């Protein structure tokens, strides 16, 4: 190949396939790049839902996906973060898609809060977060100039998966993507690279760059190219996941809720269409039938259409191998905690676009892509691992094993730095903001032993004044916000009209 790739062939299923196809086609069509999508059988069920992180909103905007139309067609909802509910002796805490506090005298808020807590402040960290407080009061938080000046006020989505994929397919059709359907494919190799994909009916689809979006099957990068995988299972206890759905809540909360049980955890994702349930557990501690009964008890809901599947966290040594780029779980499979799968798909696509080859020789782009994506995936893994390592959820066997699991060295370093002075050790390619890490550590019972001495220059009365100002801003701003249900109804109704 003399010039840059002009023919991209994507083999896969579900969101990984259709997000890859639509984003690459939309971005590269002006350069004359064609995209062919080979769709394998879906692995989704009626119970499946995609929970996003905030960056997906911007990706949708670039694709020309109208937010109100998407939420109406999918029956989706907004999410302002995750409420974590532990045992009775552990206070719930909120991981918000927004800032905790605002800077004081040019310094981040958190060390002032730590100092104040040492001197008896009763207000918890989330009291200073408009996003968390809006969610707890059943409201949506709409960004404006005041909230932008305060800090981040982001949101994400809960999207019923089958309907979301259908919406992406409509967009793909409008972009002129060539679509083929196959139950299985044969991968043709030439000089250790992929040259074409052969379908069961004899159709042969040649390409210059191939994308593996086939999920855990890793049809191209794993089965055909033999690219190895680093096993992350030693850091995670759960090896089975149960997904199910229940009837929608009468009032749809603007957040996910993770509930901790003795044998694992369960997350509820509320949408307009249904309540989607994800439950993670360890098969050596609980069989499938017992897990289903436990999930029903912990959720308090009648679970419909349960599906049980294995989970094997791990990452490809090289997500881009030869002329094949793996996207989604073909590249990296995560523990299901905090619903990062859709975000991982987006990370892979965005970095591929930023490093798309400019010539037929793309070894440099490939090496940089592998460095960046591996680093980004590891930072996401670290956030999940920290939840398990620091859990204070009692002496149940699952949580004992989680605390004893082999956490990555980066997690231990972050924990040690936080405990010493409340700081979050900065690392490249983070997906989660420092104050979200701090909220996680505080929520799990972490209390820094001290704070940076530079903040001692701020007089106590000045600190108190700023705390009162921030709490007043949060209270007033939240009271201005519409109820989440009402906002969803108005948004979807205006689109229908």
Predicted regions, residues:
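Dinucleotide-binding Rossmann-like beta1-alpha1 core, especially the glycine-rich loop
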Residues: 44-134
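Beta1/beta-strand and adjacent pyrophosphate-binding region of the FAD-binding site
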Residues: 3-14
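Long, low-complexity C-terminal extensions of enzymes
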Residues: 358-497
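Conserved mid-domain beta->alpha element of the FAD-binding
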Residues: 314-379
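N-terminal Rossmann-fold NAD(P) dinucleotide-binding loop
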Residues: 17
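Glycine-rich FAD pyrophosphate-binding loop
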Residues: 25-48
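Predominantly flavin-linked oxidoreductase catalytic cores and closely associated redox partners
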Residues: 147-291, 349
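Conserved FAD/dinucleotide-binding core of flavoprotein oxidoreductases
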Residues: 261-312, 332-344, 355-358, 362
């Amino acid at each position: 190949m003399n010039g840059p790739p002009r023919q991209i062939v994507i083999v896969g299923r579900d969101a990984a396939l259709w997000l890859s196809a639509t984003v690459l086609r939309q971005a590269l069509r002006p350069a004359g790049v064609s995209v062919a999508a080979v769709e394998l059988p879906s692995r989704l069920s009626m119970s499946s839902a995609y929970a996003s992180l905030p960056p997906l909103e911007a990706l949708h905007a670039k694709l020309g996906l109208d937010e109100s139309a998407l939420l109406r067609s999918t029956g989706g909802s907004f999410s302002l973060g995750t409420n974590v509910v532990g045992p009775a002796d552990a206070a719930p805490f909120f991981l918000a898609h927004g800032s905790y506090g605002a800077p004081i005298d040019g310094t981040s808020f958190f060390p002032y809060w730590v100092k104040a807590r040492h001197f008896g402040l009763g207000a918890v960290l989330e009291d200073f977060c408009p996003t968390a407080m809006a969610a707890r009061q059943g409201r949506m938080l709409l960004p404006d100039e005041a909230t932008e000046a305060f800090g981040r006020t982001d949101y994400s989505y809960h999207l019923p998966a089958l309907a979301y994929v259908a919406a992406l397919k409509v967009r793909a059709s409008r972009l002129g993507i060539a679509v083929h359907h196959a139950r299985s494919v044969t991968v043709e190799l030439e000089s250790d690279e992929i040259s074409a994909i052969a379908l069961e009916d004899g159709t042969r689809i040649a390409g210059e760059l191939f994308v593996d979006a086939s999920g855990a099957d890793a049809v191209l990068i794993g089965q055909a190219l033999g690219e190895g995988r680093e096993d992350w299972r030693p850091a995670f206890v759960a090896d089975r996941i149960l997904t199910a759905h229940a009837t929608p809540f009468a009032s749809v909360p603007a957040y996910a809720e993770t509930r901790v049980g003795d044998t694992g955890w369960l997350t509820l994702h509320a949408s307009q269409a249904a309540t989607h349930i994800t439950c993670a557990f360890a098969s050596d501690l609980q069989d499938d039938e017992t897990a289903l009964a436990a999930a029903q008890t912990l959720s308090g809901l009648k679970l419909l259409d349960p599906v049980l599947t294995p989970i094997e966290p791990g990452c490809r040594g090289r997500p881009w191998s030869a002329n094949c780029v793996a996207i989604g779980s073909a590249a990296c499979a995560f523990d299901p905690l905090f619903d990062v799968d859709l975000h991982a798909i987006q990370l892979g696509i965005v970095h591929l676009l930023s490093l798309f080859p400019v010539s037929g020789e793309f070894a440099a782009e490939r090496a940089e892509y592998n460095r960046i994506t591996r680093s980004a995936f590891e930072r996401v893994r670290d956030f999940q691992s920290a939840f398990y390592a620091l859990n204070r959820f009692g002496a149940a066997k699952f949580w004992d094993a989680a605390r004893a699991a082999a956490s990555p060295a980066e997690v231990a370093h972050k924990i040690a730095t936080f405990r010493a002075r409340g700081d979050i050790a900065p690392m490249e390619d983070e997906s989660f903001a420092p104050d979200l890490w701090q909220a996680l550590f505080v929520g799990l019972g972490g209390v820094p032993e001290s704070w940076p001495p530079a903040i001692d220059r701020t007089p106590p009365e000045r600190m108190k004044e700023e705390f009162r100002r921030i709490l007043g801003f949060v209270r007033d701003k939240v009271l201005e916000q519409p109820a989440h249900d009402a906002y969803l109804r108005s948004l979807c109704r205006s689109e229908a009209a």
